[in-house]
From Swiss-Prot:
Transmembrane region(s): 13-33, 72-92, 104-124, 134-154
Compartment(s) of residence: Cell inner membrane
Main function: This protein specifically catalyzes the removal of signal peptides from prolipoproteins.
Organism (species): Buchnera aphidicola subsp. Acyrthosiphon pisum (strain Tuc7)
Alphabetized GO MF terms: aspartic-type endopeptidase activity
UniProt-listed Pfam families: Peptidase_A8
Top-level taxonomic group: Bacteria
Protein name: Lipoprotein signal peptidase
Protein family according to the UniProt entry: Belongs to the peptidase A8 family.
GO cellular component, as recorded: plasma membrane
Membrane topology summary: Multi-pass membrane protein
Entry EC number(s): 3.4.23.36
Protein backbone atom coordinates (compact mmCIF):
# COMPACT_ATOMS: atom_id res chain seq x y z
CA UNK A 1 0.00 0.00 0.00
CA UNK A 2 2.81 2.40 0.87
CA UNK A 3 4.46 2.00 -2.55
CA UNK A 4 1.21 2.83 -4.38
CA UNK A 5 0.93 6.03 -2.36
CA UNK A 6 4.49 6.97 -3.26
CA UNK A 7 3.89 6.42 -6.96
CA UNK A 8 0.65 8.42 -6.83
CA UNK A 9 2.38 11.29 -5.01
CA UNK A 10 5.21 11.25 -7.52
CA UNK A 11 2.76 11.24 -10.43
CA UNK A 12 0.81 14.11 -8.91
CA UNK A 13 3.92 16.28 -8.65
CA UNK A 14 5.04 15.82 -12.21
CA UNK A 15 1.63 15.76 -13.88
CA UNK A 16 0.61 19.00 -12.14
CA UNK A 17 3.91 20.67 -13.06
CA UNK A 18 3.65 19.58 -16.69
CA UNK A 19 0.02 20.67 -17.06
CA UNK A 20 0.67 24.05 -15.43
CA UNK A 21 3.67 24.80 -17.68
CA UNK A 22 1.82 23.60 -20.79
CA UNK A 23 -1.16 25.85 -20.02
CA UNK A 24 1.17 28.84 -19.56
CA UNK A 25 3.15 28.03 -22.70
CA UNK A 26 0.24 27.31 -25.02
CA UNK A 27 -1.88 30.23 -23.82
CA UNK A 28 1.02 32.71 -24.05
CA UNK A 29 1.83 31.59 -27.59
CA UNK A 30 -1.84 31.78 -28.54
CA UNK A 31 -2.03 35.37 -27.27
CA UNK A 32 1.16 36.32 -29.13
CA UNK A 33 -0.16 34.83 -32.39
CA UNK A 34 -3.51 36.57 -31.91
CA UNK A 35 -2.31 40.04 -30.90
CA UNK A 36 1.20 40.55 -32.29
CA UNK A 37 1.94 40.13 -35.99
CA UNK A 38 4.99 38.11 -36.99
CA UNK A 39 8.17 40.21 -36.64
CA UNK A 40 6.31 42.96 -34.74
CA UNK A 41 7.54 44.08 -31.34
CA UNK A 42 5.59 45.17 -28.27
CA UNK A 43 7.66 46.88 -25.57
CA UNK A 44 6.84 45.52 -22.10
CA UNK A 45 9.66 46.99 -19.96
CA UNK A 46 12.88 48.82 -20.76
CA UNK A 47 14.72 45.48 -21.07
CA UNK A 48 11.85 43.24 -22.22
CA UNK A 49 9.94 43.12 -25.49
CA UNK A 50 7.49 40.66 -26.93
CA UNK A 51 8.85 40.02 -30.42
CA UNK A 52 6.82 37.48 -32.42
CA UNK A 53 9.07 35.18 -34.46
CA UNK A 54 8.82 31.67 -35.89
CA UNK A 55 11.77 29.43 -35.08
CA UNK A 56 12.10 26.54 -37.55
CA UNK A 57 15.12 25.22 -35.65
CA UNK A 58 16.15 24.56 -32.07
CA UNK A 59 17.69 26.79 -29.39
CA UNK A 60 19.39 29.90 -30.78
CA UNK A 61 17.75 29.06 -34.16
CA UNK A 62 20.13 26.12 -34.61
CA UNK A 63 19.19 24.29 -37.87
CA UNK A 64 16.57 26.93 -38.75
CA UNK A 65 18.12 27.54 -42.17
CA UNK A 66 17.60 23.94 -43.31
CA UNK A 67 14.99 22.85 -45.87
CA UNK A 68 12.40 21.26 -43.57
CA UNK A 69 13.95 17.98 -42.44
CA UNK A 70 14.78 19.57 -39.07
CA UNK A 71 11.08 19.66 -38.11
CA UNK A 72 10.98 15.85 -38.10
CA UNK A 73 14.41 15.48 -36.55
CA UNK A 74 13.67 17.92 -33.71
CA UNK A 75 10.22 16.40 -33.19
CA UNK A 76 11.82 12.97 -32.85
CA UNK A 77 14.40 14.33 -30.39
CA UNK A 78 11.56 15.91 -28.37
CA UNK A 79 9.57 12.67 -28.28
CA UNK A 80 12.64 10.67 -27.21
CA UNK A 81 13.43 13.27 -24.53
CA UNK A 82 9.88 13.10 -23.19
CA UNK A 83 9.95 9.29 -23.10
CA UNK A 84 13.39 9.06 -21.45
CA UNK A 85 12.58 11.73 -18.85
CA UNK A 86 9.26 10.05 -18.05
CA UNK A 87 11.06 6.73 -17.57
CA UNK A 88 13.61 8.37 -15.29
CA UNK A 89 10.83 9.90 -13.17
CA UNK A 90 9.16 6.51 -12.74
CA UNK A 91 12.45 5.13 -11.38
CA UNK A 92 13.03 7.96 -8.88
CA UNK A 93 12.06 7.73 -5.25
CA UNK A 94 9.23 9.88 -3.92
CA UNK A 95 11.67 11.87 -1.79
CA UNK A 96 13.60 13.04 -4.86
CA UNK A 97 11.13 15.85 -5.49
CA UNK A 98 13.76 18.26 -6.84
CA UNK A 99 14.78 15.78 -9.52
CA UNK A 100 11.15 14.93 -10.27
CA UNK A 101 10.36 18.63 -10.63
CA UNK A 102 13.42 19.23 -12.83
CA UNK A 103 12.58 16.37 -15.19
CA UNK A 104 8.94 17.50 -15.24
CA UNK A 105 10.00 21.00 -16.30
CA UNK A 106 12.07 19.54 -19.14
CA UNK A 107 9.18 17.29 -20.23
CA UNK A 108 6.76 20.23 -20.17
CA UNK A 109 9.06 22.42 -22.25
CA UNK A 110 9.81 19.68 -24.77
CA UNK A 111 6.08 18.96 -25.06
CA UNK A 112 5.18 22.63 -25.53
CA UNK A 113 7.67 23.08 -28.35
CA UNK A 114 6.70 19.71 -29.87
CA UNK A 115 3.06 20.83 -30.00
CA UNK A 116 4.15 23.94 -31.93
CA UNK A 117 6.20 21.91 -34.40
CA UNK A 118 3.31 19.50 -35.01
CA UNK A 119 0.60 22.16 -35.43
CA UNK A 120 2.56 25.04 -37.00
CA UNK A 121 5.73 23.51 -38.42
CA UNK A 122 7.79 25.88 -36.25
CA UNK A 123 8.10 27.05 -32.65
CA UNK A 124 6.59 30.39 -31.64
CA UNK A 125 9.18 32.49 -29.79
CA UNK A 126 8.43 35.91 -28.32
CA UNK A 127 10.42 36.77 -25.18
CA UNK A 128 13.10 39.28 -26.17
CA UNK A 129 15.46 40.39 -23.40
CA UNK A 130 17.78 43.23 -24.35
CA UNK A 131 20.09 45.92 -23.07
CA UNK A 132 20.08 48.89 -25.43
CA UNK A 133 20.89 47.43 -28.86
CA UNK A 134 22.13 44.05 -27.58
CA UNK A 135 19.42 41.36 -27.75
CA UNK A 136 19.58 37.87 -26.29
CA UNK A 137 18.07 35.05 -28.40
CA UNK A 138 14.27 35.22 -28.52
CA UNK A 139 12.62 32.38 -26.60
CA UNK A 140 9.34 31.21 -25.02
CA UNK A 141 7.98 29.76 -21.78
CA UNK A 142 8.71 26.18 -22.90
CA UNK A 143 12.36 27.13 -23.41
CA UNK A 144 12.44 28.70 -19.92
CA UNK A 145 11.00 25.50 -18.48
CA UNK A 146 13.69 23.37 -20.14
CA UNK A 147 16.42 25.77 -19.02
CA UNK A 148 15.23 25.87 -15.40
CA UNK A 149 14.93 22.06 -15.34
CA UNK A 150 18.51 21.69 -16.60
CA UNK A 151 19.81 24.24 -14.05
CA UNK A 152 18.08 22.36 -11.21
CA UNK A 153 19.62 19.07 -12.36
CA UNK A 154 23.06 20.65 -12.64
CA UNK A 155 22.78 22.07 -9.12
CA UNK A 156 21.70 18.69 -7.76
CA UNK A 157 24.43 16.78 -9.57
CA UNK A 158 27.28 19.22 -8.92
CA UNK A 159 26.45 20.17 -5.34
CA UNK A 160 26.99 16.66 -3.98
Amino acid sequence: MKQKYSKKSKKWIYITTIIFILILDISSKHLIIKYIKTYDTKKIFSVLNFFHVHNHGAAFSFLSDQNGWQKWFLSTVSILTILVMTRIITKLKKQETKKITAYSLIIAGATGNLIDRIFYGFVVDFIDIHINDWHFATFNIADCSIFIGIIILMRINYST
